[in-house]
């Protein structure tokens, strides 16, 4: 089957699953604010769990107590686009590449991040962008 015969949503399936988890965690977090403590705490043993959990947590409230939509929205749109591109161009390697980008950003953040609690999937978004850009140059793929 040719890639052009498959609908675009087939490539968006796994990114949408990841985002659905993020949005469910975010909705839960709007009720229980202390959930974001499971982010990455650089160079602290208690922060190691954040290497796995931090991409799923996004800020839920602004300082005035109102709901903060910006963090999760600003991660969701680029993740959907870049994640779908990863599936499209690297269908057989998608999970392997995503795993290493996911773990790599968490380890990098734990090793070199500021001494604060870090949450959100921005690191994965930047890693996806970097990977797709650099691999495009290496492969000389104009798409």
What does each model-found stretch correspond to?
Residues 3, 87-94, 138-143:
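Membrane-interface helix-boundary motifs at transmembrane edges
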Residues 73, 77, 121-130:
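Membrane-embedded alpha-helical segments of multi-pass membrane proteins
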Residues 83-87, 130-139:
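Hydrophobic transmembrane alpha-helices
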Residues 111-114, 125-128, 132-135:
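Basic, gly/Ser/Thr/Pro-rich low-complexity segments located predominantly at protein N termini
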Residues 14-98, 103-118:
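N-terminal TM1-TM2 helical hairpin plus the immediately adjacent luminal interfacial "cap"
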Residues 2-17:
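N-terminal membrane topogenic signal
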């Amino acid at each position: 089957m040719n890639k052009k015969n498959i609908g675009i949503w087939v490539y968006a399936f796994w990114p949408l699953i990841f985002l659905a988890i993020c949005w469910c965690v975010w909705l839960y977090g709007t009720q229980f604010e202390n959930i974001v403590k499971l982010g990455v705490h650089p160079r602290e043993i208690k922060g190691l769990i954040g290497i796995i959990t931090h991409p799923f947590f996004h800020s839920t409230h602004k300082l005035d107590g109102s709901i903060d939509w910006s963090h999760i929205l600003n991660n969701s749109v680029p993740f959907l686009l870049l994640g779908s591109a990863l599936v499209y161009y690297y269908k057989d390697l998608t999970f392997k590449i995503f795993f290493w980008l996911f773990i790599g950003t968490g380890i990098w953040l734990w090793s070199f991040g500021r001494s604060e609690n870090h949450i959100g999937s921005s690191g994965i978004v930047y890693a996806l962008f970097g990977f797709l850009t650099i691999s495009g140059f290496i492969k000389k793929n104009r798409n």
